[in-house]
């Protein structure tokens, strides 16, 4: 297995692109399949065992909701 370097990327998408990615994620979750997504040139394979959560942050007049998917590689 290759040793991957640390990475922290935030990518903006149009509403249509974001909806498409969420729809593919929902379809994968419902069917019990792994989810694949390409972000900034790297293909990411999200395993079925991943943990999903939603985070809400507020600071001053700015608010943020993050849909998070977490897992550990073996």
Predicted regions and their residues:
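N-terminal acidic leader/helix
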Residues: 2-30
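N-terminal intrinsically disordered, cationic/polar leader segments
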Residues: 2-8, 34-38, 42-74
């Amino acid at each position: 297995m290759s040793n991957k370097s640390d990475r922290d990327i935030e990518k903006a998408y149009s509403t249509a692109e974001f909806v498409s990615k969420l729809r593919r994620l929902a379809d994968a979750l419902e069917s019990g399949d792994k989810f694949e997504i390409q972000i900034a040139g790297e293909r990411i394979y999200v395993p079925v065992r991943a943990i999903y959560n939603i985070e809400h942050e507020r600071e001053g007049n700015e608010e943020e909701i993050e849909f998070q998917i977490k897992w550990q590689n073996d």
